[in-house]
Amino acid sequence: LICDGFHINPAVLRITFRILGEDRTVVVSDSMRAAGQPDGDYDLGGQMVQVRGGHALLPDGTIAGSTTNLHEELKNLISFGIPFRQAVKSVTINPAREAGAADRVGSLAPGKLADAVVLDAATYDIRFVLMNGSVVYRA
């Protein structure tokens, strides 16, 4: 599921999360190379893409991809009314399991990589990021 609030209507996401349940929802970013870039026109691999208001569109108005990331999508899910635990699982252990990588990533457990993003409990902003147990980013 792409949970940028553009690809899929938030009401449809709420229904989907309710039907699929806590362990079957998987969120992906579908981010393209224009992700994080300001509004403008971009040539991405010979394809013209217009970024307007954070949305990537082809010149005919077709969605060209997403300009969001999983952190933004997690915050979106919470704002759409998805329970926190279900939202977190949809961007961590569930995709890791579907990719066959749950033995290494997706949750914190002995023997797994110590990768984690620590969020502010009130705002869900990133406080710091751990990769393999080392802090690689601190807000």
Residue locations for each model-derived region?
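Short alpha-helical
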Residues: 7-8, 124
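His/Asp/Glu-enriched, well-ordered alpha-helical/loop segment
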Residues: 1-5, 12, 16-119
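Short, Lys/Arg- and Gly-enriched loop/turn segments at beta-strand edges
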Residues: 123-129
